[in-house]
Amino acid sequence: MKKTARLAIVLFALVLVFTLSFTAFADGEEAADVAEAAAEEPSPVTGTIIAYIGAALCAILAGIGSAYGVMIGGKASAGVASENPDLFGKLLVLQALPGTQGIYGFLVAVLVLVMFPAGGDVTEGLRFFVASMPMGIVGLISGICQGKAAVAAIHMTGKQPDASGKGITMTALVETYAILALLASILLIVL
């Protein structure tokens, strides 16, 4: 739990530093320097680049969480299935549950790419960047946590095969927070 909390704090700090650095870049320079730089060459930082970085981070972070969750579920499933191969179907469902966060992160990334206006400015890019972060960060953490819940449910199913439905329910409860983050990101993008 402490490792996940530390990871969340580090990710939040990175997102905050990234966002503030772009805000400072867009607003904090002296007017003469900005006018002089604009006359010489265009800024390498555009709204499109910022939005696309947010989309990429969302898909990457949620994908990492899902990959890790499915991986630890797979390791536990392999151990249980080696002793009781008849449980493979039930174990596969439990192992696959943490994979949904990666799908949600990909969905938000595609939504950012489709909804970002052509020629959007830095402020619009930051808005889309920030809008993609709830799903990216929560997808990472909830994918890992759902994988841990799936491991416990897999072990429970190995000992009591009739309890797999209860294990699915317990594992699916973690999904609630990924769905809330998905909704938050979608609302921040479209509104």
Q: Across the structure, where does each feature detected by a protein language model lie?
A:
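Hydrophobic, small-residue-rich transmembrane alpha-helices and their short perimembrane loops
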Residues: 3-15, 19-191
